[in-house]
């Protein structure tokens, strides 16, 4: 794993490709405020990692265990802490500059992790894309779930059976998205396509694992 950044989703817009003229939908992610919180080494902690803090927070709003952690590190409390496993050669030197947009470059492939929009309690057709039952000819099922295995042997509902329930509001990772542009003056990264979450939600951007 490599070092990544924490960001906040600003919204979506579009850019035009300079060569083909094609319109490219992009997501704008604000990454201003990433700071090195803690550097973990194999000798001291058993593994190499970099802990990144993002989005300053009042000390009164932080739980006591976290407040003690921030006090020990000597940094201002933040809303988010994210740890990135890295190789020993990737650990920053003491006094190194905090990570910023220059960590990524245009054309690079990344993975984006976020929390999808919550959609509340939904039926099986919307939640799992079921086809549905007949809409006419005497059918009274319409949008119902249908059989869930009660007449099978053994007659019980199996674990992980697709049924109505809470939809969305879950951690999701979108892989292999392309960085279209990096704008250091605005501290934003423009990534092709859509990413999970609503405007203002937190995202983690990391180099793509499968590229």
UniProtKB/Swiss-Prot annotation:
PROSITE patterns: RIBOSOMAL_L3. It comes from the Bacteria. GO terms for cellular component: cytosolic large ribosomal subunit. The keyword rRNA-binding applies. One of its GO terms (molecular function) is structural constituent of ribosome. Keywords: Ribonucleoprotein, Ribosomal protein, RNA-binding, rRNA-binding. One of the primary rRNA binding proteins, it binds directly near the 3'-end of the 23S rRNA, where it nucleates assembly of the 50S subunit. This is Large ribosomal subunit protein uL3. It comes from Akkermansia muciniphila (strain ATCC BAA-835 / DSM 22959 / JCM 33894 / BCRC 81048 / CCUG 64013 / CIP 107961 / Muc). The gene is rplC.
